[in-house]
């Protein structure tokens, strides 16, 4: 049995925007909350957060530090490192969960809010991971303004590249699609031409980074270089859903253009409730395309739903006690 320090109304798994927003909301609702944070936020490589009203341009690490301080200020508890890494979670007969952590500790939770995020799996091109979030990009709403009017290249690994090229064309009139492992057909080329996007054939084998530590070009297999200051890629989204699959909730697949581009956890879009009673999900683990502001909003909505669920359970328990019902 977990001791008093290891018992919480709600355990929040994940200390990013969704998890901390949920923890803050629950703590302000006078719930005992424990955040388990392994310390690997999705946007760690990025220098700034954009599109978050009141926080545009904030450093991601500093934004999370402020969020932790706010949640702690209302009584939430936060564990990081091994103590914040969830190894497994098991349902307890009669209600609640036992959450096992990397340091060997066990936490008893009445409800779970899973906000573990996802992993971005990049195409296997040398150098991409080192530049990810800097000048190897995915979301124009996160980074488009910073590379506006610069020469941009889109790494084509599937039909989604046509959509990406047309979208990024909003921020620059110098967009090139590179037929890396997928070449557009006649209809796609017509669409690209209508948007003013050039198509260059050839597999990308590397990146050329200038002395200013900025991307200067991509290198093709035949030795040609294509100048660009940012490279747009389509990562595969892999949900960090181990704690949920361990409880029996399978992953769902994400499809774009008839192709599977990742995995996520299904949850109610309004409340975050999953098919598992007592378990909610918020943020990129359930909505891979969500930005920081949206992930935080999901955390708040899930927290409200969890608090409501706890109130209903407490009311039922009080009714049974008043009637002298057993159990």
Task: Describe each region flagged by the PLM.
Residues 7-9, 81, 148-149, 276:
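Phosphate-coordination loops involved in phosphoryl transfer and adenosine-cofactor binding
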Residues 121-166:
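Glycine-rich dinucleotide-binding loop and its adjacent helix/turn
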Residues 130-146, 237-291:
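FAD-site-proximal beta/loop scaffold in flavoenzymes
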Residues 3, 8-65, 150-151, 160-182:
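Beta1-alpha1 glycine-rich phosphate/pyrophosphate-binding loop at the start
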Residues 65-66, 71-101, 106-109, 172-263, ...:
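A Rossmann-like FAD-binding core segment of flavoenzymes
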Residues 22-24, 162-164, 282-327:
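A conserved FAD-binding loop/helix module that cradles the flavin
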Residues 2-5, 92, 104-106, 129-131, ...:
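Solvent-exposed alpha-helices and their adjacent loops that cap or buttress functional pockets
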């Amino acid at each position: 049995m977990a001791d008093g320090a290891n018992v919480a109304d709600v355990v929040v798994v994940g200390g990013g925007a969704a998890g901390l927003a949920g923890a803050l909301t629950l703590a302000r609702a006078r719930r005992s909350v424990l955040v388990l944070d392994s310390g690997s936020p999705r946007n760690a490589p990025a220098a700034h957060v954009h599109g978050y009203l009141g926080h545009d341009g904030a450093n991601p690490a500093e934004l999370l530090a402020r969020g932790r301080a706010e949640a702690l200020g209302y009584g939430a508890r936060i564990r990081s490192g091994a103590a914040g890494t969830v190894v497994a979670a098991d349902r307890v007969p009669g209600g609640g969960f036992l959450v096992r952590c990397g340091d060997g500790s066990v936490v008893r939770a009445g409800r779970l809010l899973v906000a573990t995020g996802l992993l971005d799996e990049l195409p296997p091109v040398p150098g991409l991971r080192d530049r990810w979030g800097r000048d190897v990009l995915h979301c124009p709403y996160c980074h488009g303004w910073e590379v506006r009017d610069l020469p941009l290249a889109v790494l084509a690994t599937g039909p989604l590249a046509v959509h990406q090229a047309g979208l990024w064309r909003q921020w620059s009139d110098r967009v090139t699609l590179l037929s890396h492992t997928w070449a557009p057909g006649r209809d796609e080329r017509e669409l690209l031409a209508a948007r003013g996007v050039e198509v260059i054939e050839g597999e990308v084998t590397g990146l050329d980074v200038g002395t200013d530590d900025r991307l200067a070009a991509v290198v093709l297999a035949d030795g040609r270089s294509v100048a660009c200051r940012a490279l747009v890629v389509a990562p595969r989204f892999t949900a960090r859903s181990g704690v949920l699959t361990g409880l029996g909730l399978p992953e769902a697949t994400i499809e774009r253009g008839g192709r599977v581009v990742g995995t996520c956890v299904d949850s109610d879009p309004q409340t975050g409730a999953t098919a598992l009673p007592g378990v909610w999900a918020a943020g990129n683990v359930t909505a891979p395309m969500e930005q920081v502001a949206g992930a935080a909003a999901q955390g708040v909505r899930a927290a409200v739903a969890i608090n409501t669920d706890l109130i209903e359970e407490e009311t039922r328990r009080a009714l049974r006690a008043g009637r002298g019902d057993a159990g």
